[in-house]
Regions:
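Internal helical hairpin/lid segments
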Residues: 187-263
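Structured C-terminal subdomain patch of bacterial secreted/periplasmic proteins
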Residues: 248-291
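A short, well-structured juxtamembrane/interface segment
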Residues: 14-30, 158-172
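Anionic-ligand anchoring segments at beta-strand to alpha-helix junctions in alpha/beta enzyme folds, i.e.
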Residues: 25-78, 170-215
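Cofactor-/ligand-binding subdomain signature composed of acidic, glycine-rich
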Residues: 1-22, 281, 307-308
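Short amphipathic alpha-helical segments and helix-helix/interface helices
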Residues: 94-98, 166-167, 192
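Internal, active-site/partner-interface "lid" segment
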Residues: 147-172, 278-306
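Glycine-rich phosphate-binding loops that contact phosphosugars or nucleotide phosphates
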Residues: 32-161, 229-248
Length: 309
């Protein structure tokens, strides 16, 4: 699968794309107290978008229970909207919209797929452009949504990444940990998902906020684990001293910056290790991946981008 890029290349491509293509503006103030639902990193994107706001965030495993638990607030019109986040507009997002409608909630779909099954039944849509990417990557899909809310400049992020000097001996480590400023904790599960997608059981990749890192995450130290810390708070305790890398950040950064930086670093790991993802993604997309959803049709190994991509 030589045509499959690594994650870091996908980040650069997405930032270059958004530097040239306009995004819709996501005005979060229009939502007073929504239920936000998404699967995988769509769920984590919901956590990012509504961090610091009144919202209930659920995923495909918790949505049925969540919406029932808040039935009284829905009936009282305190909760009036369900925001469904789905890049593809397929899979779980279809029944999630149908369920929200049964509860008389207004459904707003955030998607990159205007012709999808969910797009046909949602009350409203916000459509995002995207680039072609390997299946599961979803860099441009969710990055576009985050940028539309934070209004960060993709060119500034791109310049930072292109100037970043990778630590000497980076590829010699056999495990990696990322420590993020506490305010960006919502990104840590996104890294964990990328670990599962790209490396499975083959490599250790962990991500914590500073606050979580203090809770016995580094009881066991190993000089072969590189601990990468982002931000001005110095890592004085986590990992072996000779196996730490501190990356200072600009004074003002937001979620899109941290998402791009962490994904870029994961891509650096990916390109320096065996091609676990590239060697397995074809079989996943053509066999057991779609079968888990009860589908016979294969997934696209390269998910097409927008028409203007």
């Amino acid at each position: 699968m030589k045509n499959i890029i690594n994650l870091d290349q996908g980040v650069i491509g997405a930032l270059e794309f958004f530097s040239k293509n306009k995004l819709p503006k996501l005005n979060l103030d229009q939502f007073t107290f929504p239920i936000v639902v998404g699967s995988g990193n769509a769920y984590n994107t919901g956590q990012i978008l509504f961090s610091g706001r009144k919202a209930i965030v659920a995923d495909e495993s918790t949505f049925k229970k969540t919406i029932e638990n808040y039935r009284d607030l829905i009936n009282k019109k305190i909760i009036k909207e369900a925001i469904i986040i789905s890049a593809s507009g397929e899979k779980d997002s279809i029944w999630e919209i149908e369920l929200a409608k049964k509860y008389k909630l207004k459904t707003i779909l955030l998607t990159c797929s205007p012709d999808s099954s969910s797009a046909k039944i949602a009350d409203e849509m916000i459509i995002y452009p995207k680039v072609s990417e390997p299946y599961t990557y979803n860099i441009s899909t969710y990055l576009g949504m985050v940028l539309s809310a934070t209004s960060e400049n993709p060119k500034l992020i791109l310049n930072f990444l292109k100037k970043l000097k990778i630590k000497n001996g980076f590829k010699s480590y056999n495990s990696y940990s990322l420590i993020l400023p506490d305010e960006f904790i919502a990104i840590t599960p996104m890294i964990d998902i990328k670990k599962s997608e790209l490396f499975g059981p083959k490599l250790s990749l962990r991500a914590f906020s500073f606050g979580h890192a203090r809770h016995a995450k580094f009881v066991i130290r190993d000089k072969k684990e590189l601990v990468i810390t982002l931000g001005k708070e110095k890592n004085m305790y986590f990992g072996e001293p000779q196996s730490r890398w501190q990356i200072d950040l600009p004074n003002k950064v937001d979620f899109a910056f941290i998402l791009c930086l962490t994904y870029y670093l994961v891509g650096q790991i990916q390109k320096n290790k065996p091609a676990y993802f590239k060697n397995n993604i074809k079989n996943y997309c053509q066999d057991y991946g779609p079968k888990a959803y009860g589908h016979n049709k294969s997934f696209d190994i390269i998910v097409p981008g927008s028409i203007n991509n």
